[in-house]
Amino acid sequence: MSLVEAIVYLIASGGHGMRVDQIADQINALKLHQRKDGQPVTLQQVYAVIMRHPETFVKEDGRIRLIM
């Protein structure tokens, strides 16, 4: 699954917002997204994806939430 799909899945499954570091940790722990080089997903990558999709995500009180 793509990184944006993995982020949406985690936030929707949890039912509440998550911090960026929590999202990155869960993506890696659950192996929801694999980088082409085999390295773990970084919190910088997660943050960059979130910032590229303002129509999907909002940052409130240090947590990332879905706009839906």
Predicted feature locations:
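Charged low-complexity interaction tracts in eukaryotic proteins
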Residues: 1-4, 18-21, 26-68
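Short helix-capping/hinge SLiMs at alpha-helix to coil transitions
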Residues: 12-16
